[in-house]
């Protein structure tokens, strides 16, 4: 007796996770062959789910381990040189400059003790300023050889060269007080002369001694040699030692020339030269202090150029909005410009806008220093698509 069994023509397996996904085994599959009787082919469809649903599957690992990242290119810090290390790398010309600074101090004392004229006090102060400037320049050149001075690190983003700004700012304040003190001396002498007009003939001319001529000649000689041997630096900085060497050299040569011709250094000429040096030191110190204060406050010195640069950027019709614009100067040789824009164009238009903005910055605020050595500009343009 033959029993009829209902053989299913297809087996449909319902996915317990998604009811819409099923796997069907049809009776239209190829028949198993004699060589491989147990072969069973499964129809693979795009909706077929591969893998498994165990708890250790990658799809269930919500907290994956972090990817291997390269170490930071910027180090945390550089070793700070000690005084012994700084003195060990001094070259022979630098040691010679330090020795000449001591000579400046000795000549300043000799000029001050050689007479009572006001110009002698002024020249002695000017010689002291030259000696201090020589020490600062040697210190600056020596520290420039270390990595921590100009290289960027996390502890010092712009290097330790920003100490240079603090030292120069302190020196400019010293120049201001020195100029005010030198202005006070001729004013006091003028008031005394006006109060004692009937004794003016007794103090019209000051006695000239041989050591006065020697002191003035020595100050002229060392200032002249310092002016000739002082090469201009390749870096931009506010304090120019050549200017101060010339400020001492010119009055010394004038006084030596007058003394050699037989003229005595009268009070009028003494006060005139003293006032000239004092006013020059005061004006120069104030201008240096103002520009360095703006650098220390992380701003830019020329506001008109900054406004011109921002207005030129806003005039570009391709720019939808200027989000921010920050232009500042952290050091003599470094200027930073950060610009944020919103542009609706594609990648090519964004690249063209970025190049035009860099060109505008270099033509406006980047050219205020004139010819010669220019500061290094770090320009970043952040463009967002509208």
Swiss-Prot record:
Its main location: cytoplasm. It is found in: Cytoplasm; Nucleus membrane. The chain crosses the membrane at residues 102-122, 128-148, 163-183, 208-228, 243-263, 268-288. It is a multi-pass membrane protein. GO terms for molecular function: zinc ion transmembrane transporter activity. It comes from the Eukaryota. Disruption phenotype: Leads to sensitivity to camptothecin and DNA-damaging agents. Keywords: Cytoplasm, Ion transport, Membrane, Nucleus, Transmembrane, Transmembrane helix, Transport, Zinc, Zinc transport. GO terms for biological process: intracellular zinc ion homeostasis; zinc ion import into Golgi lumen; zinc ion import into organelle. The keyword Glycoprotein does not apply. InterPro entries: Cation_efflux (IPR002524). One of its GO terms (cellular component) is cytosol. Belongs to the cation diffusion facilitator (CDF) transporter (TC 2.A.4) family. SLC30A subfamily. Probable transporter involved in the regulation of zinc homeostasis. Interacts with cis4. This is Probable zinc transporter zrg17. It comes from Schizosaccharomyces pombe (strain 972 / ATCC 24843) (Fission yeast). The gene is zrg17.
């Amino acid at each position: 007796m033959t029993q009829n069994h209902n053989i299913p023509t297809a087996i449909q397996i319902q996915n317990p996770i998604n009811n819409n996904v099923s796997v069907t085994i049809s009776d239209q599959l190829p028949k198993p062959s004699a060589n491989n009787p147990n072969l069973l082919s499964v129809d693979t469809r795009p909706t077929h789910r591969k893998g498994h649903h165990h708890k250790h599957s990658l799809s269930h690992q919500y907290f994956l381990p972090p990817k291997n990242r390269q170490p930071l290119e910027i180090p945390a810090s550089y070793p700070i040189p000690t005084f012994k290390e700084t003195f060990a790398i001094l070259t022979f010309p630098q040691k010679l400059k330090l020795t000449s600074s001591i000579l400046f101090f000795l000549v300043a004392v000799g000029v001050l003790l050689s007479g009572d004229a006001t110009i002698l006090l002024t020249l002695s102060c000017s010689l002291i300023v030259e000696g201090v400037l020589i020490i600062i320049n040697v210190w600056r050149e020596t520290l420039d050889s270390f990595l921590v001075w100009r290289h960027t690190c996390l502890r010092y983003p712009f290097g330790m060269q920003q100490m240079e700004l603090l030292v120069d700012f302190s020196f400019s304040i010293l120049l201001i007080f020195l100029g005010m003190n030198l202005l006070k001396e001729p004013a006091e002498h003028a008031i005394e002369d006006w109060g004692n007009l009937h004794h003016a003939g007794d103090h019209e001319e000051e006695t000239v001694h041989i050591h006065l001529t020697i002191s003035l000649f020595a100050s002229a000689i060392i200032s002249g040699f310092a002016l000739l041997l002082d090469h201009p630096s390749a870096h931009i900085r506010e304090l120019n030692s050549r200017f101060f060497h010339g400020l001492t050299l010119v009055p010394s040569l004038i006084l030596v020339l007058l003394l050699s011709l037989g003229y005595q250094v009268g009070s009028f000429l003494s006060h005139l030269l003293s006032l000239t040096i004092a006013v020059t030191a005061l004006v120069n110190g104030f201008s240096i202090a103002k520009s360095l204060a703006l650098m220390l406050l992380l701003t830019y010195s020329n506001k008109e150029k900054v406004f011109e640069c921002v207005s030129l950027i806003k005039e570009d019709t391709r720019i939808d909005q200027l989000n921010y614009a920050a232009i500042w100067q952290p050091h003599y040789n470094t200027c930073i410009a950060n610009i944020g824009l919103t542009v609706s164009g594609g990648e090519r238009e964004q690249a063209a806008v970025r190049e035009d903005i860099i060109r505008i910055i270099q033509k406006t605020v980047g050219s205020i220093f004139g010819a010669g050595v220019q500061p290094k500009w770090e320009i970043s343009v952040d463009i967002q698509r509208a």
